[in-house]
């Protein structure tokens, strides 16, 4: 859970390493680093959701709109506070994760994956650290 600026920087750094982004690149390249951009927006949304105050609330709604637009563009549905640090999305397209799921750090997820609950229950998957999730 991202509660402070230090936590946000740590999560973003771990995600950047997991995506194998070169350390000398500080910003996502337009049209190329769409997954990295998605993860930055996701982490910023998590940060502002977990903090209180008018400033954080306004930025949460702004980032949530950006996240929903990017989710529709990439066909990825991941809600805030589901993944730990070190998230690596291999390819965009067809990724759906239940908002009640909790997945640990250093997770790599491929396209065509659905992590959900059964029979309409609120209980969802609890997946540990250092996992590789793929279709099949």
Predicted regions, residues:
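Short amphipathic alpha-helical segments, especially helix-boundary/capping motifs
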Residues: 17-22, 60-62, 81, 109, ...
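Left-handed beta-helix
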Residues: 85-86, 90-99, 104-105, 109-111, ...
């Amino acid at each position: 859970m991202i509660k402070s600026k230090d936590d946000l920087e740590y999560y973003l750094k771990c995600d950047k390493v997991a995506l194998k982004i070169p350390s000398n690149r500080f910003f996502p390249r337009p049209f190329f680093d769409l997954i990295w951009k998605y993860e930055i927006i996701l982490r910023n949304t998590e940060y502002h959701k977990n903090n209180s105050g008018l400033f954080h609330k306004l930025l949460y709604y702004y980032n949530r709109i950006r996240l929903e637009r990017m989710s529709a563009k990439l066909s990825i549905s991941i809600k805030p506070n589901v993944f730990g640090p070190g998230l690596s999305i291999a390819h965009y397209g067809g990724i759906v994760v239940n908002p009640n799921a909790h997945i640990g750090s250093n997770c790599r997820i491929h396209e065509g994956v659905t992590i959900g609950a059964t029979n309409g229950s609120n209980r969802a998957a609890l997946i540990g650290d250092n996992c590789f999730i793929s279709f099949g």
